[in-house]
UniProtKB/Swiss-Prot annotation:
InterPro entries noted in UniProt: AsnC-type_HTH_dom, GntR_C, TF_FadR/GntR_C, Tscrpt_reg_HTH_GntR, WH-like_DNA-bd_sf, WH_DNA-bd_sf
Protein's name according to its UniProt entry: Uncharacterized HTH-type transcriptional regulator YdhC
Keyword line: DNA-binding, Transcription, Transcription regulation
Annotated DNA-binding residue span(s): 37-56
Amino acid sequence: MDDFKLDKPTPYYLQFYNQLKKMIFNGTFKPGERINETQLAKSFGVSRSPIREAMRLLEKDGLLKADDRNGFSITSLTAKDVDEIYKIRIPLEQLAVELVIDEADEEELTILEKQLEETEKAIHNGTEDTEIIRLNQKFHELLVDFSHNRHLKNLLEHVNDLIHFCRILNYTGDHRAETILREHRRIFEEVKKKNKEAAKQHVLAHFNHDCEHLKHVLEEGKEN
């Protein structure tokens, strides 16, 4: 906590919300770990009130779960969670690629292609996983941005944190970065050709592969 400094103009609970989310995503807190509100308040040197408000927001995002002792623990994804998240995500991102084909201009397509090239370069250079994950996340964000549909973007933002949770787990295993990049390229090639049905099928195949891999990772976690 030593590197965390309060920014007075921003409400404290929002600062703690962002900091705690970062700590969940970087593995400081592990899935299933119980969060001690009093201990966090002491560590940050504040009252419990802004910590409690931050934790309520994280519960709303699906990153924390209330327990039967009036506390919270870090969400542990289940196979059912993965199914439910991707049942939302697949049709929305299929719609996104359709809209990109209709709405995106040449400059935006070039940005998408450069994003894939940057990811490939990072993988080749042995860049750490957190950066590869960020670059691949950016590809999906650009697809949604270039759909030019703010309501679609808002819908995806409601489940964005849980999607990111899945994305971190999805990079467990050998050659996952290369596999995911290859699937992203297939989607982009069909977008460039303006082939809506093929682009949607590649989105479906990509996410089906993700689901299968995530369930395998979760099953292995149970066994270990």
